[in-house]
């Protein structure tokens, strides 16, 4: 599991400068680990998840006015248009049905010059150990709806109206493709 810890340290190192002094929406926060690691970098973090149990766990030890946790549906966010400088959706697009619909909602709440950051497990490149972990995730209630290679995932983002400005594949037991994106202007 040391490999996973190294990959997550690399992920946080990539995220910190991208959220520096920004207003951030994190979707699918789970237990809030990303939001907790970015607290010193961002001006404010609105961290959401569809699971009340996950949000309850994330709120434990949350003593900062810079961070707020709430239960929200990523397909129907309650925020005004262009509310956030950065939207982060980490390790979630591969487990939700119709991830392209979530991208439409992220576009709506993201400022025109904002950044979507979407690190996602790219299961199609799994090792046998990674395949076993993917099976364990499915059994735990996180079924794979999309199984991408890194290249296919980046193409998916581009096909759905995003310009990928930066991408890195982090070596994890399941490869983690980090993508920073900007909105493509609609005509």
What are the residue ranges of the model-derived segments?
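A short acidic, Gly/Pro-enriched loop at the edge of an enzyme's catalytic core
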Residues: 75-86
């Amino acid at each position: 599991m040391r490999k996973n810890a190294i990959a997550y340290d690399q992920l946080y190192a990539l995220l910190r400068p991208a959220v520096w002094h920004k207003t951030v929406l994190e979707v699918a926060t789970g237990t809030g680990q990303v939001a907790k690691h970015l607290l010193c970098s961002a001006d404010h973090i609105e961290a959401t998840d569809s699971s009340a149990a996950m949000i309850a766990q994330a709120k434990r030890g949350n003593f900062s006015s810079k961070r707020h946790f709430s239960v929200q549906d990523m397909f129907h966010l309650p925020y005004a248009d262009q509310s956030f400088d950065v939207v982060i959706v980490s390790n979630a697009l591969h487990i939700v049905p119709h991830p392209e619909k979530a991208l439409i909602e992220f576009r709506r709440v993201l400022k025109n010059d904002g950044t979507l950051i979407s690190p996602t497990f790219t299961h199609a490149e799994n090792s046998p150990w990674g395949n076993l972990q993917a099976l364990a995730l499915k059994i735990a209630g996180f079924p794979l709806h999309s199984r991408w290679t890194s290249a296919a995932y980046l193409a998916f983002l581009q096909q759905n109206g995003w310009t990928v400005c930066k991408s890195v594949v982090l070596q994890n037991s399941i490869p983690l493709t980090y993508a920073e994106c900007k909105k493509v202007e609609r005509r």
